[in-house]
Structures are given as structure tokens and as C-alpha cells.
């Protein structure tokens, strides 16, 4: 810095006024940037912010279940692209596939003002694809408000759970006291020698007390399942058709609902070379991940976008296609696999989306990038789909006779449960589709 001061104070002799002006501007700018780069205070601040961000990333990733981490990576991967100044090869060599520029002073101030939970949520939103240019003081305050509301609801839920627990304990204690009182009354009556003829019998008193207990308990009535789209649906009232989306199901998707023998027979006679000549064992394995037509109940619902993310459009085989994916888990044969539910559609002549591809694809955290990469998806997609084949309206779909399954919709997930027709208490297979991460 002293050398720069000398060069500014002692410019070379023989310069014109214009040359001297440019010379001084250049070296003053160099001094300013030098002071910026060599500022110990600045680097200490950057080191502090890096430590905060790294700890937040660690807490986020270690605190998530595998399917939640898949959802985080998938959502962020859909929204992020390589920066213009990096080619894909250079970025891979640099191991710097994606980055965002965020104001370190703003992030540090947010951490000091609101604490670690808000900082963690800010980092989570960056991982979900939030651009650094969109992170300003107003956005930080909005995130802080969301975190506060989330904490308030959590506290209310905890308080409610404690009250319910205390209530259950009080009910149990009251029941125990009544039973003890009843036993004492019975002993007292047995000890009496003469009983009034008009006194109520012991059985009558017990009956009355029993009726009182039933009235106090209130007797909650369990909601019965209702038939929805060929499946037994639990977890809420039946909604009207208003707002539900229109879909048709292509024959190649419906084929997987049949028996393995029938599926093999039809594929062997069909035009798709990838399925011809497959063994019956292979068909049985593929049926497990392809026979998930119950997913359309979710896809047609008003809040389908809360579960499925748009994986892009492309043209192939003479038609424009769209791909959607959702994070899920498949439980079958005592095993649990995490992965994605893939849905491929094209539009028919009336503009109605036709589902020609439906599959659960087991996916590891390391391979999630390929699953959501439009180029990889397009390359692996079926070459040509016979768009003239007969399709079925999704709202009219019913599983073949003998198949028992039900759909269960909850706050953060949607489940399809296949059961043993002979013993419905036995679950043969379960597919869980998870809600997308919250983007602020």
C-alpha cells in the first residue's frame, strides 16, 4: 500500500495533464481495491459468514430424512443453471457446478438479529434455488416472519399434545376412582343385613354408572372410507370435481395393471423393442414399479403442484412431451426404496394430457441430478408413442377385479396402499409421495 501511495504522489515526469489524470485515476482505483482485498476486518467477516453457512448446511442435511434430502436437491437442481462465464467442462474441473453471490454483511446482520434458525432457513432457500440478487433486507424479514409462525405453531402443537396427555391421565384416574368407589359400594351392600325392597338392585346401579361413563366419553365416531376412483380413500371429506385436472391414461400405462402373464403377452406382440422378449420374472419386477396408476388420483387433484415439480418439455417421436417428477418411497417385500415418481404426458387432439409413462424409479442422492436433467430424461424416453391408441379417462379408471388398494391423503404425503384381497390387514405394497419443500 505504501508503494501505491508513492506512485500516486510521484507520477512520472513529462506527462501531459490528460495522461496524468488517467494515470492517477488508475492507481487510486488500484489502491481502493487493494485496501478492499487486504482488509483484515473484511476477511474476518467473510470467514465468520462461511462458518455460519457451513454449519447451517450441515444441520440442514443431517437433520433430513433421505427422501427430504432428495426433495431438497431435486427442487434446487430444477431451478439452478451453470453461470454463463463457466462452460460445463470447466465447471466440472473446478468442482464448482453452482454458486450464488449474496451480501455477506446482510447475511451476518440477519444471523445476529434473528439467530440461527432464520439463517438456516435462508441457506435452505439458497439450496432450493433462491437467487442471491433476490435476497435483500425485506426478504430476510419475510423469512424471519415465516420461521416465527412455524415456531408458534410448533409450540401450540406441543401445548395441545401436553393438554391431551394430561386429559388422558385425568380420565384414567377418574375411571380408576369410579371403579374403586363402585367396589367399595358393593362391599358395603354385601355387609348390610336388611335391604329395602324399594332400593335399586346392584345390577341396575352398575348399568346406570356405565351409561354415565359412556356419555362422558362422548364416543368419537370413526369416519368410514369412501370409494374414490376405484380405490378406497381415507383422510377427509369427498371433494367436488371443481378444480380437478383432466387426464387420460395411455394403453401402455394401463397394461401394467394386468397379470404378469398378460403383460408379457401384450409386450411381446407390441411394437416397443425394449419390452419384447423380457422374462416373466423381469415383468414381475417391473410391474412393482410401473403398476402405480393410483398416483393419478393425486395428479388430478387441486394441489397436485404441491407434490409434483415440472421437469421440462421437449419434442420426441413427433410429439411434444412434458415430464413431471415427485419424491417418493416404495415399500414392498420388507424393503423400502426412496426415489422419484415419474410422469410423462403428451396432449391429444382435444388438448387433454395423456399419461403415457408412469413409474417409480429408485434413486440415490448421488444420481438425483441425472433423474431431473432434461437431456438425460429425453435420451432415455421411449422413442415413439402410438398416439392413436385408445386411452381411458383417469376419472373412470378402476383396477381389475380382485385388486384391493386404497389412497390415503395426509398433510405432507399421499399414500397408495395395496392389500391382500383375502386378508386386508396384510399390506402387500405401499407407495408414499411426499410434498415438495416449502419455497419462500
Swiss-Prot record:
Cited Pfam families: DUF1609, DUF3654
Residue ranges of the TM segments: none
Region (Disordered) residue spans: 150-244
Basic residues biased stretches: 234-244
Extent of Basic and acidic residues compositional bias: 150-186
Entry's family note: Belongs to the UPF0329 family.
UniProt protein name: UPF0329 protein ECU06_1680
